[in-house]
Regions:
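Acidic (Asp/Glu-rich), glycine- and aromatic
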Residues: 43, 50-56, 60-65, 160-207
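Extended, loop-rich substrate-binding clefts of extracytoplasmic carbohydrate-active enzymes
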Residues: 88-163
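Active-site/ligand-binding surface loops and adjacent short beta/alpha elements
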Residues: 180-253
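Residue-level recognition of well-ordered beta-strand positions that form the cores
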Residues: 45, 135-137, 151-155, 170-174, ...
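Extracellular/lumen-exposed scaffold segments
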Residues: 55-106, 205-227
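Beta-strand-rich N-terminal accessory domains
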Residues: 19-86, 161, 304
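Bacterial N-terminal signal peptides
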Residues: 3-14
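Beta-strand-rich recognition/accessory modules
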Residues: 244-322
């Protein structure tokens, strides 16, 4: 036994000596995976993943984990998974783009958001954050015509020693050359979150809170705010609570914007609730959102402090020069 341990220690020392220039493993990584998935990992543990299969109706992020392995989000409405199949955990979409519906999955005039590029230069890994950049086309299902050319960047940034983290979503939306595209007045779009069943107010006894101190759907529904938090139970442990604060950025149109939030477990940040927005190939729409994923039931002061922190971060460059 002693002899075996001696040879093992010699082997380890030898291996270490053979790699004197070995570099530390980057803590936060965006890892390309099979089947059009990019996994965002902290110290090898997946926090979330971007699903960008061109055959899907739209790209989306799932799962979304705090410090436990249980996802804080789900696919579909817990009581109507087929009718709400478009509730894809965390997703970007809109139900009135020209005359097309990109919100639902079975509309009369159906739109689809198709990923067309994830460039190698779009992946960045550091000890502080990881990101990936992609290009999506918003197309008509009927004739495949392009309505919107979207550049999207997802950044994962751990906070407080990884006890919580930001998912920052940067978007640029433009029409094809020579065209004008209109985002109609609606409460459905642009970024939305379907919470886990146990977090919902109706199903799990969770809680909604916005930046104005308003609580749950009767007070929060379609009210302007800087952010909105949805927190609830995800395990039966005494401290088994977690949540997500969805944050709007001051650079976005109509800030502070309305939040479309329901006690049944979903929340969205409205882009054009009452006022349509037009984009062209020159007049592009630049947007920035964040999700603060956290353990526990967030207080108003905690979510507000995180919102301030989010707004003070440098705005990402969506068109960096190739290295």
């Amino acid at each position: 036994m002693i002899r075996a341990l001696f040879f093992l220690s010699c082997g380890l020392a030898s291996a270490s000596g053979q790699l004197p220039s070995a570099k530390p493993v980057t803590r936060v990584q965006a890892v390309p995976m099979p089947h059009h998935i990019t996994s965002f990992q902290l110290d090898g543990r997946e926090l979330t993943a971007m699903h960008h299969n061109p055959q899907d109706m739209r790209p989306f992020w799932h799962p979304v984990r705090a410090t436990r392995d249980t996802s804080l989000t789900r696919m579909g409405h817990p009581h109507d998974p087929l009718g709400h199949s478009h509730h894809n955990s965390v997703w970007v979409t809109h139900n009135m783009v020209n005359d097309l519906d990109f919100w639902g999955d079975r509309a009369k005039k159906q739109g689809r958001i198709v990923n067309v590029e994830v460039s190698p230069e779009g992946y960045e890994d550091t000890d502080e954050a990881a990101s990936m950049r992609m290009v999506n086309h918003w197309i008509s299902e009927a004739d495949k015509s392009i309505q919107i050319i979207e550049v999207r960047r997802t950044e994962i940034r751990p906070l407080d020693g990884a006890r919580s983290w930001f998912m920052i979503v940067d978007l640029e939306l433009a029409a094809p050359k020579g065209r004008t595209t209109t985002f109609g007045a609606t409460g459905f779009g642009l970024i939305a979150v379907r919470m886990a069943r146990s977090i919902g107010v109706h199903d799990g006894g969770g809680r909604i809170l916005n930046s104005e101190g308003q609580v749950n759907e009767p007070q929060v529904f379609r009210k302007p705010a800087r952010w909105c938090d949805y927190s609830g139970r995800i395990s039966n442990d005494a401290d088994g609570f977690a949540g997500i604060t969805l944050m709007n950025h001051p650079m976005n149109p109509h800030h502070p914007t309305a939040f479309h939030v329901r006690d049944d477990g979903w929340m969205g940040c409205c882009l054009s609730l009452d006022t349509p927005l037009e984009v062209t190939d020159v007049k592009k729409l630049r947007l920035r959102y964040a999700l603060w994923v956290h353990d526990g039931v967030a207080t108003q002061a905690e979510s507000e402090a995180r919102w301030v922190q989010f707004t003070q971060l440098p705005v990402a460059d969506l068109h960096p020069r190739k290295k």
